[in-house]
Structures are given as structure tokens and as C-alpha cells.
């Protein structure tokens, strides 16, 4: 029996837990079953209590104290420990039916998604290649305020593409916190970010003035230098060559926005194709023999 799930990922501050809460609320409103899994060992509080919490197995605070590791090293240790104790996941997830949407709330350290092979191993165990047989989709969140700084936006886009290539699973990329940029960017301009128009970088490079000589170690000198422009151009060309990344817009305060994102997730994991037709309620049954035709 297949199961269905979504890995909610993205850099710290992108609004992952807030999106999870909005998604759970929407699912409850529409009477859909969900199972909330927290996989962030450093998490502190939630709007909805997780049904399964990695902190019951291991916490980042304990690891940093006992192993004398920093935050990043401690997080890597936590995931290594999880991979050694996968029965912690299987015992809770195996009984779930195909009616559930399993929501995995992931940590914000993007190195887990981009170049450390821990998460691909976890995905392989959870997905249809592993014993749990979960149809998985990754939802990668990027904060919409990144569009104010084009270079920062394309760096975030590059990290999203890196996660797509490394995890090798269906992906939905999301620009979160859209309510914060409505008055900053026009709709026409925002559309170029949603569809990732690499000419945005070229526009910025072409319109920039020649850098003024200054301290080569200063931030302003570095960001206006020719090397930085060449780097931006190379990043834009790489993203354009793959043509993989586009974004959905998300405002968690807007029910229709959450529903639209969920619809794309459902399509990616083929959720509705596996659902059995529901029997009508007794009060909705019609006696066609007595009905006027």
C-alpha cells in the first residue's frame, strides 16, 4: 500500500514551520487526514504538536553538550543517529493508510540538502525505493524578500536546484511570505522571478556603473567588481541551462494560496489517483423509484 508525503525544506527563516501549520489547518478544514513529523532536532515550539518528533529520539542541545560539537556538526550527528535508528520512523509511519498526507518539517541548514549525502539516504528509505513506500515530494521554500536583492535570489534559486539534483525526487519550489513584497515589487516584475528569468541578472549587470577603485577587501568593492559580475553571469547561465526551477507564490494568510500550493503537491505525488471513491452519506441517498423524472 502506497503512502504519501511532503518534505518541507529550505533555508532558515524561510517559513517552513509556518507553512506546515497553514497546511495542517487547511487539511483539517477540508477533512483530510495528515500526520505531522518534526525532523528538526533544534526546534523549540510549534503551533501544532507533532505526531512524531525527532526530539524524542535525540536533540541538538544534548548532542552539542555531550559531544562538544557546534550547531552544524551537531545537526549532522543527529541525522547520522537517525539513520542508525530508522525503526523510530517505520514504527510510527508504517501503520498509516493512503488517506494520510505525511508532512515532514525539515531543519534549515541547507547543506543537508545540497552536498551532504545524509538526506538522500533518508529519502531513499522513506520513498518508494524503501520499505515505507511513500510517494514523496519536496517543497523547497525561499523567502520572497530575496527578490529585492537579485544576486541573493539567484543564490537561493541555485540552492533549490542543487537540492532537486541531489534528492532526485519531485520538487515544488515556493516563494513564501508573499505578503511582505506586495508593495515592493510590481506584478510584472514578480512574474519574472516566479518563472526565473535569468535576464534579471543581466539587466542588473548591464545597468551597473563601472566600479570605483577602493579597498579590495571591502564588501562594496567586492560586490561591484568585475569578478562578482562574472560570477552572477555564470550562475544565471547555469540555472538557464538546466531550466528546472520555477516558483509558486505562497501567502499563508490566504486560504486560496495554501490550497493552490497543496494542489501542486498532490499532483506531484499523484495523491488523488490512489484515493477510493467515497460512498455517499445515507442522508444524501436518493430513492429514484419515487423521484420525479
Curated annotation (Swiss-Prot):
Keywords from UniProt, A to Z, are:
GTP-binding, Hydrolase, Nucleotide-binding
Q: What's the protein here called?
A: GPN-loop GTPase 3
Kindly list the positions annotated as binding GTP. Answer: 13-18, 176-179
Q: Which InterPro entries does the annotation name? A: Gpn (IPR004130), Gpn3 (IPR030228), P-loop_NTPase (IPR027417)
Does the UniProt entry include the keyword Signal?
no
Task: Provide the function of this protein.
Answer: Small GTPase required for proper nuclear import of RNA polymerase II and III (RNAPII and RNAPIII). May act at an RNAP assembly step prior to nuclear import.
Q: What lineage is this protein's organism placed in?
A: Eukaryota, Fungi, Dikarya, Ascomycota, Pezizomycotina
GO biological process: what's one of them? mitotic sister chromatid cohesion
Instruction: Tell me yes or no: is Kinase among this UniProt entry's keywords.
Output: no
Spell out the residue ranges making up region: Disordered: 272-293
Q: Which organism is it from?
A: Aspergillus fumigatus (strain ATCC MYA-4609 / CBS 101355 / FGSC A1100 / Af293)
Position of sequence motif Gly-Pro-Asn (GPN)-loop: 70-72
Q: What quaternary arrangement does the UniProt entry report?
A: Heterodimers with gpn1 or gpn2. Binds to RNA polymerase II (RNAPII).
